[in-house]
């Protein structure tokens, strides 16, 4: 079962994202878009300012020359953000390029095969999928039920998840707390599962044979899982059990 302190960390990321989306509209020099249905920033539209968008459905195909703060039930970013991205909602999709850092909380975030994050990724929620071809140039900090990495993290990945699958590349270290493969169906994140979320994968750690970890893999779990690590990290592997009272 996912450790309580990391469940709280995920909730903290979700709360911080929600509060930012909720109150940032009070800041001056900020363009605001909103509506009850769908708000679209067209492909040929360029916004030379920070932008706040809130709607049930949000699609950003254009260019934001500033920070983008967006909240909605379904959010898709296909365009370019030349600042940082703060994104909260249920079903989130990033297919474009973000020059800065991505701060995101929601039921699910999918980072598409052409997506690029210029700095760091912070995510809290149920499911994060980084597809083959995606790039996070610096670090990834993830707290949730599952993280499936098919793309690349340039530096370190710090993860607390019931399930962690690495099939892509991590340039630095992987520091992870992962669930027990025997704990199928025993997750504190069950209440977050909503329509549109990806299927739940089996708990535990899995490193595929095509994966690359340039640094050290350090993982904490109730049980050691050597058979699930099918690629040798450059810095070796360290396993440890949870400290008493952290579950």
What are the language-model segments listed below?
Residues 27-247:
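Soluble extramembrane regions of membrane proteins in the secretory/endomembrane system
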Residues 2-13:
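Bacterial N-terminal signal peptides that target proteins for export
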Residues 14-16, 246:
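Residue-level detector of solvent-exposed, low-hydrophobicity positions
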